[in-house]
Amino acid sequence: MHIERLDFENSPYLGVFGVATDRVVLIREGLQEKKLEVIRETLKVPVIEVSVMKSRIIGTLATGNSNAIILPWYVWDAEIERIKKALSEYGIDMEVVPFRSKYTALGNLILTNDKAALVSAKFSRKEAQEIGEILGVEVERGVIAGLHAVGSAGVVTNKGGLVHPETSDEELEWLSDLFKVDVYVGTANMGVPYVGTCMLANSNGVVVGHLTTGPEIVKIEEALGFV
């Protein structure tokens, strides 16, 4: 299956607790093995359990694509080394970079695939350029539907994108041009507009919160290129 419903200890906000790329998924510590297996089988990449200063909200704090993982600057050295060691054991060559900024909810403020990154306009132009260089992609500063939390308001892979339902047609066109994929509006978890918080997705599949309805799943599958 390209899409599976899941909960993390009854929370439907899967995107808060993980970062999905086409090469690896970083996920919070402490999930049941059967849930890790659903993620592995659906997204078809290795899954690494991680923490950031012992926090479980990995998807809020970190982001990444096939080239690099970006973490907040205060992540412990031991946590960085654990991620690097796990990547090495899987034969995955990726940068793992702590990023110094006063903004540390990087997963909320950065939306990226392997083609481009959209970063919140809260970041300076210099910071945006640095983020683009780390991720190895074109970068733009901006908002989605008036929201700085672009990583929460959207999910984008190398096959498609889904964003906040109040995103304008002009913004959709701009996002499609930037990320080089078709981008649609939609919701998850029974009407939640912050779709980035609700799912973990890559080019192989998507794991979405267990409250997501049938019609929402149809739209998610279409938007992320699985139809």
Swiss-Prot record:
<dbReference type="GO" id="GO:0043022">
    <property type="term" value="F:ribosome binding"/>
</dbReference>
<dbReference type="GO" id="GO:0003743">
    <property type="term" value="F:translation initiation factor activity"/>
</dbReference>
<keyword id="KW-0648">Protein biosynthesis</keyword>
<dbReference type="Pfam" id="PF01912">
    <property type="entry name" value="eIF-6"/>
</dbReference>
<comment type="function">
    <text>Binds to the 50S ribosomal subunit and prevents its association with the 30S ribosomal subunit to form the 70S initiation complex.</text>
</comment>
<protein>
    <recommendedName>
        <fullName>Translation initiation factor 6</fullName>
    </recommendedName>
</protein>
<comment type="similarity">
    <text>Belongs to the eIF-6 family.</text>
</comment>
<dbReference type="InterPro" id="IPR002769">
    <property type="entry name" value="eIF6"/>
</dbReference>
<keyword id="KW-0396">Initiation factor</keyword>
<dbReference type="GO" id="GO:0042256">
    <property type="term" value="P:cytosolic ribosome assembly"/>
</dbReference>
